[in-house]
C-alpha cells in the first residue's frame, strides 16, 4: 500500500487526506498544533465562496469547477462527507446588469441571476454549501488507513531512495512516504525551499467572526446543519440556524448593528436578541494567506536547483516552452485566500489524481495558473527581457 504524509491539519490537509484515502493510500497527517482545523479551527461553520466575473477569469473558473467537482464527489464516492456539507445556496450580490454578464458563460444550473426578498440583485449559486470543518475532519478520520500525529513541527523534507523522508525541527526522522503534501500555509513554501523571488510577495490578512447562541450553548460548538442566507448587503457572510445559532463576519456584524438591518425575517424577540452587542462573542482570529495573483498554489514543488542550472533555456524558449523541472511526489497546496472550502477540495483532487497517474482534473491552462512554479517562470522571462535591452 502506498503511503502519503500530509503536513498540516487545516482544510487543505483534510481535503488531501480524504482524496488519498479514497484511493486506498495509507495516510498520515502531521500537525504542529494540538488541534485540527488550521485557520478555521475555532469556527463551527464556514461557507463555500464561489464567485463570477464578467470575463469568467481563471479564478472564477477554478472556483466554479471546485464547487461542481466536490458536489459530484459527495453524491458518489465521498458520500460519507455529506453530514459536513449543507447545500443551501449563496447569493453573490451585484447589480442586475453585471450579474447578467457574469452568468452568461455558465450553465443556469450552476448560477443564475436572482433577486433577494429584500430587493437586492446578484448571482445565485444553488449548490453552495455551508461547511462544518469539525465534521469534515471527523468523517475523514473514520476512513481506514488515516492517522494523525499532533505536536509535530516539521523542519525539512528530504528526498530518499524510494520517496521522501520527513524530519522534524529537532533533526529526528518522523516519517517516510511515497508522496508528501505540504498543506501548511506559508510554512509549505519554506519546506519547498522557496523564497520571495520564487513565490512572490505574500499577504496575511486577519479574519474574525462573531457568534451568538440563543439556546445557551457554547458559541464554538457545531449546532447542526445551518442555513446559508442570501448575502444581501454585500458586506460579508451570514450563516444561521434559526432559533439557536448565528455566525456573521465582523463587517456584517458592525454594519447590521449600526444600520439596524437584518438579513432575514426572524421573529421580533430573536431580532432583539441579535441587535444587542453583548449577545455576540468574538471568535478566534485566523489568518488567510494570499498570493499576489489571488490564486492558490496547487501541484508539484519546483526543482529549484535544476531550474537555476537551466535558467537561460527556460526563460528564452517561449514558442516551444520547456517544462519547468519539478520535484514529483512533493506537492504544495496552499495560498487559499479565504476560499479554502473550495480550493482545498479541488487542489487535493488534482494532487491525488496526479500522484496516481489519473487523467488531469482541470485543463492545462488552469493547472498552469496555479502551478507552484508560475512565479519563477515569469521572473526568469523578465530577467531575460531585461538582459536583451542592456546588451549581452
Residue spans of the language-model regions?
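Short hydrophobic core segments
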Residues: 7, 30, 175-187, 348
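Active-site substrate-recognition segment that forms the wall
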Residues: 15-23, 37-47, 52, 81-85, ...
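Dinucleotide-binding Rossmann-like beta1-alpha1 core, especially the glycine-rich loop
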Residues: 45-125
Amino acid at each position: 500500500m502506498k503511503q502519503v504524509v500530509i503536513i498540516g491539519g487545516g482544510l487543505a490537509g483534510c481535503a488531501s487526506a480524504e482524496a488519498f484515502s479514497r484511493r486506498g493510500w495509507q495516510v498520515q497527517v502531521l500537525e504542529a498544533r494540538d488541534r485540527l482545523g488550521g485557520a478555521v479551527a475555532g469556527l463551527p461553520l464556514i461557507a463555500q465562496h464561489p464567485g463570477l466575473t464578467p470575463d469568467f477569469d481563471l479564478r472564477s473558473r477554478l472556483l466554479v469547477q471546485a464547487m461542481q467537482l466536490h458536489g459530484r464527489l459527495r453524491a458518489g464516492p465521498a458520500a460519507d462527507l455529506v453530514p459536513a456539507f449543507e447545500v443551501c445556496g449563496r447569493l453573490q450580490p451585484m447589480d442586475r446588469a453585471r450579474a447578467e454578464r457574469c452568468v452568461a458563460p455558465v450553465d443556469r444550473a450552476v448560477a443564475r441571476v436572482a433577486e433577494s426578498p429584500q430587493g437586492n440583485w446578484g448571482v445565485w449559486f444553488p449548490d453552495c454549501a455551508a461547511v462544518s470543518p469539525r465534521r469534515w475532519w471527523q468523517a475523514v478520520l473514520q476512513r481506514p488507513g488515516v492517522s494523525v500525529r499532533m505536536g509535530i513541527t516539521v523542519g525539512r523534507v528530504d528526498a530518499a531512495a524510494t520517496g521522501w523522508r520527513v524530519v522534524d525541527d529537532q533533526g529526528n526522522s518522523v516519517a517516510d512516504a511515497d508522496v508528501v503534501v505540504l498543506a501548511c500555509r506559508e510554512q509549505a513554501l519554506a519546506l519547498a525551499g522557496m523564497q520571495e523571488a520564487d513565490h512572490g510577495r505574500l499577504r496575511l490578512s486577519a479574519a474574525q467572526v462573531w457568534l451568538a447562541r440563543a439556546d445557551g450553548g457554547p458559541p464554538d460548538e457545531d449546532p447542526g446543519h445551518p442555513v446559508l442566507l442570501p448575502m444581501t448587503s454585500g458586506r460579508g457572510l451570514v450563516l444561521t440556524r434559526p432559533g439557536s445559532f448565528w455566525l456573521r463576519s465582523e463587517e456584517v456584524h458592525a454594519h447590521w448593528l449600526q444600520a439596524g438591518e437584518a438579513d432575514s425575517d426572524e421573529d421580533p424577540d430573536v431580532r432583539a436578541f441579535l441587535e444587542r452587542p453583548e449577545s455576540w462573542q468574538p471568535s478566534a482570529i485566523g489568518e488567510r494567506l494570499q498570493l499576489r495573483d489571488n490564486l492558490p498554489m496547487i501541484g508539484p514543488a519546483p526543482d529549484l536547483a535544476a531550474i537555476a542550472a537551466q535558467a537561460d533555456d527556460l526563460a528564452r524558449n517561449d514558442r516551444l516552452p520547456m517544462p519547468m523541472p519539478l520535484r514529483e511526489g512533493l506537492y504544495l497546496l496552499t495560498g487559499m485566500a479565504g476560499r479554502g472550502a473550495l480550493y482545498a477540495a479541488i487542489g487535493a483532487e488534482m494532487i491525488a489524481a496526479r500522484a496516481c497517474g489519473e487523467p488531469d482534473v482541470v485543463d492545462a491552462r488552469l493547472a498552469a495558473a496555479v502551478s507552484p512554479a508560475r512565479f519563477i517562470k515569469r521572473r526568469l522571462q523578465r530577467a531575460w527581457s531585461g538582459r536583451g535591452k542592456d546588451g549581452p
